[in-house]
């Protein structure tokens, strides 16, 4: 199992050199050597060693990136991401994984003790991304674009089968007569769901077919292949209650903003641009040559995007 990693914070890019390659690190006075400087703060060798003890399985680049991000995002969003908020999030994830929590942490090179500061950094980055989305992306043009493909809530039976033959037989039986339809609905009562075009639990192909149906109508057999598992499923949809979005976009403004938010959170170029913005704002400078390219994945992506 893997915990969701926001943006590009927890990258697994190894530094070209390990901790021991830092020039002068073997001397007794090296602890105060600057690795990264920024407005009002500094990351020294001693900070890196401390971070390495807490996250022994993380590569050096990741340690330095997260130390930097924690500092720069705390300046703007530290009051938004409180200890109470972090504890609540940690508890939620722990409850979600249950008895598998410890093993899931181990797979990520984390412990219960280190997971809290890890999650805090994740939440700080998310706060920065959300702020940028709110300030720059909820434009009329973006809302209108999201509106074009948006469909409001519908309620339907969404039934999946592992073979096309099984799905075809189930569909034929359901469409045969009223008794067949009633049997289909009773058998698949737990498959009655409400969803809209932003739902992630219903495949896109199924949504497209469902939104064309009138109340009481059945779809043809719909084939959908999971991008994560590669498995193909065959779906049948019976529409219970459809809906029309009408012409009033403002009625669904919140939903459309969520569409934009989800899209931008998954846009690595946008996320890199947000990080690059705060790196520049805080005048983050890498002093140690071994880590000269530490933030290039963010700044280069941002520059490439802005030049288009």
Swiss-Prot record:
Lipid-acceptor residues (S-diacylglycerol cysteine): 25
Keywords: Cell membrane, Isomerase, Lipoprotein, Membrane, Palmitate, Rotamase, Signal
GO cellular component: plasma membrane
Alphabetized InterPro entries for the sequence: Foldase_PrsA (IPR023059), PrsA_foldase (IPR050245), Trigger_fact/SurA_dom_sf (IPR027304)
Any one GO MF annotation of this record: peptidyl-prolyl cis-trans isomerase activity
Primary enzyme class: isomerase
PROSITE patterns: PROKAR_LIPOPROTEIN
The keyword Membrane appears for this protein: yes
Highest taxon of source: Bacteria
Record keyword Mitochondrion present: no
SUPFAM superfamilies in UniProt: Triger factor/SurA peptide-binding domain-like
Reactions accelerated catalytically: [protein]-peptidylproline (omega=180) = [protein]-peptidylproline (omega=0)
Locations listed in the record: Cell membrane
Residues with lipid group (N-palmitoyl cysteine): 25
Gene3D superfamilies linked to this entry: Porin chaperone SurA, peptide-binding domain
BP GO annotations: protein folding
HAMAP family xref list: Foldase_PrsA (MF_01145)
Note: The conserved PPIase motif is absent in this protein but it still has foldase activity.
Protein name, entry field: Foldase protein PrsA
